Amino acid sequence: MFMILIINNHGQYNHRIHRTLRYLQIPSELVPNTTPLDEIISRDPEGLILGGGPSLERSGNCVEYIQKLEIPILGICLGHQLIAKAYGGEVATAEAESYAQIELEILDEDDIFRGLGPRMSVWASHKDEVKKLPDEFDVLATSSICEVEAMKHHDKPVYGIQFHPEVHHTREGHRVFENFYDVCRS
């Protein structure tokens, strides 16, 4: 059965990701970030969403999932930062913490931003951000407060987004999930 696993990184919006996917009728399950890799593999998911969370230190097995799974991955907020770190990028405290509505400038509408550009109103809720993009990644979107709002691996279906598509403040956020679902099905 088709399934996307959502990794719960203890963030305030992780349950909203699951609720949004259920609303979109995308089969999914929310699992703890301490779930062993072999259990994740045994569930045979078609995709993985790494939810947000309070800190890199509480990210459980996420880096192992990123490095060893060969399936589409979407990292949101902390998940985005974990992808960057797993591939050699750098994460540090943002110049200004952001808990606000911001305007995203979409640089590449490919894949997860298909049909959403060139601008999108989104909700930002973070104190850390990707400061150095990993070598194998391209920037997909930027904003006035964060240079790497979204990124994509050159060759793999691995994406990271700093903002929160699962909250109602992000207009058209559900379409990011629909587009990721399409990536998982292709």
Swiss-Prot record:
<feature type="active site">
    <location>
        <position position="164"/>
    </location>
</feature>
<dbReference type="GO" id="GO:0005524">
    <property type="term" value="F:ATP binding"/>
</dbReference>
<feature type="domain" description="Glutamine amidotransferase type-1">
    <location>
        <begin position="3"/>
        <end position="186"/>
    </location>
</feature>
<keyword id="KW-0658">Purine biosynthesis</keyword>
<keyword id="KW-0067">ATP-binding</keyword>
<dbReference type="InterPro" id="IPR004739">
    <property type="entry name" value="GMP_synth_GATase"/>
</dbReference>
<keyword id="KW-0332">GMP biosynthesis</keyword>
<dbReference type="InterPro" id="IPR029062">
    <property type="entry name" value="Class_I_gatase-like"/>
</dbReference>
<feature type="active site" description="Nucleophile">
    <location>
        <position position="77"/>
    </location>
</feature>
<dbReference type="InterPro" id="IPR023686">
    <property type="entry name" value="GMP_synthase_A"/>
</dbReference>
<keyword id="KW-0315">Glutamine amidotransferase</keyword>
<keyword id="KW-0436">Ligase</keyword>
<dbReference type="InterPro" id="IPR017926">
    <property type="entry name" value="GATASE"/>
</dbReference>
<comment type="subunit">
    <text>Heterodimer composed of a glutamine amidotransferase subunit (A) and a GMP-binding subunit (B).</text>
</comment>
<feature type="active site">
    <location>
        <position position="166"/>
    </location>
</feature>
<comment type="function">
    <text>Catalyzes the synthesis of GMP from XMP.</text>
</comment>
<protein>
    <recommendedName>
        <fullName>GMP synthase [glutamine-hydrolyzing] subunit A</fullName>
        <ecNumber>6.3.5.2</ecNumber>
    </recommendedName>
</protein>
<keyword id="KW-0547">Nucleotide-binding</keyword>
<comment type="pathway">
    <text>Purine metabolism; GMP biosynthesis; GMP from XMP (L-Gln route): step 1/1.</text>
</comment>
<dbReference type="Pfam" id="PF00117">
    <property type="entry name" value="GATase"/>
</dbReference>
<dbReference type="GO" id="GO:0005829">
    <property type="term" value="C:cytosol"/>
</dbReference>
<dbReference type="GO" id="GO:0003921">
    <property type="term" value="F:GMP synthase activity"/>
</dbReference>
